[in-house]
Amino acid sequence: MSDIYQHFRKDERAFIDQALEWKRIVQEQYRMKLTDFLDPREQVILSAVTGQADVGLAFSGGYDRAERKRAILFPEYITPEESDFELQAFNVRYADKFVSVDHRSLLGALMGIGLKRQKFGDIVFSETAVQLIVSADTADFVAAQLTQAGKAAVSLEKIDLSDLNIPAVDVEIRDDTVSSLRLDAVCASMSRQSRQKSQTLVKNGLVKVNWKVVEDPSYIVAEGDMLSIRGFGRCSLTKIEGKTKKDKWRVTFERQK
């Protein structure tokens, strides 16, 4: 069983252990296991860990292109329904003629009321609405406690998932080759700049991997990682497809324009 760790980073071992425990519960107790919200990398790990026929796996974040999703692990004779994911969506109401609400202020407000990041999913911005998705067990607490986001007074209105106003997204998918899976090399490819410049950005704390600042240029990235470079934006490393004859890694990036 310990051999599974060699395929992942050392800092991912705690999550691997958690995933193995979820799997054990399903196998031994013959019941579904619902997780908190997982980021894309955690979804990749969970998919790898549960890769056996006797345990099924399904994800939902409330809409098709959701980034953060809850997972259900289930016995093979059970088929989960959407309601089993226990998601609640909200409209965020505020005086938009006088103040604005952005992703950072709303994220900070949710964390500020003591809500753990695992308890809420995507924050969705469209031309007509700001909406968010939380776990159903925290919905009443969030509705009662979230009254301010930045300088804006806010209130929440419960809505059905079908009423989410998901904007159309123009996605750029780009294939490339990189000499290494080091963070500086991948960031250089992702942002189309020199490796030296990428090293400087990493060392200056301007690069995040899965929402955490990483200042080590030699950090090895993995499939499913979300990379963020300040001033450039975010890209998902969606595929790593082995090496070319010239010993370079084939990678695929996905970026929302």
From Swiss-Prot:
Residues 181-251 form the S4 RNA-binding domain. Residues 87-166 are annotated as: Central region. It is found in: Cytoplasm. Changing R182A: Synthetic growth defect with ssrA deletion, no longer associates with 50S ribosomal subunits, does not complement rqcP deletion upon overexpression, does not increase Ala tailing. SMART domains: S4 (SM00363). Keywords: Cytoplasm, Protein biosynthesis, Ribosome biogenesis, RNA-binding, rRNA-binding, tRNA-binding. One of its GO terms (cellular component) is RQC complex. The keyword Lipoprotein does not apply. Disruption phenotype: No alteration in cell division. Has a synthetic lethal phenotype when disrupted simultaneously with trans- translation; double ssrA-ylmH deletions grow poorly at 37 and die at 49 degrees Celsius. GO terms for molecular function: ribosomal large subunit binding; rRNA binding; structural constituent of ribosome; tRNA binding. Transmembrane segments: none annotated. GO terms for biological process: rescue of stalled ribosome; ribosomal small subunit biogenesis. InterPro entries: Nucleotide-bd_a/b_plait_sf (IPR012677), RqcP2_N (IPR048443), RqcP2_RBD (IPR040591), S4_RNA-bd (IPR002942), S4_RNA-bd_sf (IPR036986). Residues 1-74 are annotated as: N-terminal domain. Changing K197A: Wild-type protein function. Has 3 domains, an N-terminal domain (NTD) which contacts helix 69 (H69) of the 23S rRNA, the central region which contains an RNA recognition motif (RRM) and the C-terminal S4 domain which interacts with the P-site tRNA and H69. The NTD and central region are required to complement a double ssrA-ylmH deletion and to bind 50S ribosomal subunits. The ribosome binding site of the S4 domain overlaps that of RqcP. In the presence of chloramphenicol (a translation elongation inhibitor), but not erythromycin or lincomycin, associates with 50S ribosomal subunits with or without a tRNA in the P-site. The S4 domain binds in a similar position to RqcP. Part of the ribosome quality control system (RQC), a ribosome-associated complex that mediates the extraction of incompletely synthesized nascent chains from stalled ribosomes and their subsequent degradation. RqcH recruits Ala-charged tRNA, and with RqcP directs the elongation of stalled nascent chains on 50S ribosomal subunits, leading to non-templated C-terminal alanine extensions (Ala tail). The Ala tail promotes nascent chain degradation. RqcP2 (YlmH) overexpression can compensate for RqcP's role in Ala tailing during RQC, restoring Ala tail addition to peptides in stalled ribosomes. The majority of tagged protein is associated with tRNA-less 50S subunits, suggesting it might also play a role in late stage 50S subunit biogenesis. This is Ribosome-associated protein quality control protein P2. It comes from Bacillus subtilis (strain 168).
